[in-house]
């Protein structure tokens, strides 16, 4: 058997073993099925500069590799989240209601089922209409942080 052929067989066996062992590694994330209406909502927030009063969060999970949280956020009717940015990308799904978002200077209206990608460092603010709360499902690609932008 020539050396090239033997090297290929050894390489293929090693790749096969590596792939098999990767497939057998358990995920550090636990399975979850969640009815967001039954989530463990935290108390309404108090007044803090830039943050809407009365927002409620329900933590769902934190990615053990990136530190990125997944959580529910309920913004009260008529609330506003001042212009800010985050280090990491944030993805959001509107679960209930309607929200207006200014994202890097462009105005958008998002309704139930809409998907929003907010790239890291993109300036954005949220405004909730006066008639109803909005519920969002959000996930960050890294630890949560907030940097407010001066008007």
Task: Give the positions of each predicted feature.
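A short, N-terminal "cap"/entry segment at the start of jelly-roll beta-barrel domains
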Residues: 22-67, 151
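Glycine- and acidic-residue-biased ligand/ion/polar-headgroup-sensing regions
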Residues: 76-77, 86-104
């Amino acid at each position: 058997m020539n050396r090239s052929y033997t090297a290929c067989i050894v390489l293929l066996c090693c790749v096969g073993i590596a792939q098999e062992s990767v497939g057998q590694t358990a995920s550090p994330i636990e399975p979850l099925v969640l009815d967001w209406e039954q989530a463990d909502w935290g108390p309404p927030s108090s007044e803090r500069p830039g943050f809407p009063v009365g927002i409620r969060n329900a933590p769902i999970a934190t990615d053990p590799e990136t530190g990125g949280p997944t959580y529910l956020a309920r913004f009260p009717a008529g609330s506003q989240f001042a212009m800010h940015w985050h280090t990491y990308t944030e993805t959001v799904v509107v679960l209930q209601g309607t929200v207006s978002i200014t994202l890097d200077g462009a105005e958008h209206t998002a309704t139930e089922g809409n998907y929003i990608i907010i790239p890291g460092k993109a300036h954005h603010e949220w405004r909730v209409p006066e008639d109803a709360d909005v519920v969002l499902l959000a996930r960050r690609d890294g630890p949560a942080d907030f940097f407010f932008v001066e008007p």
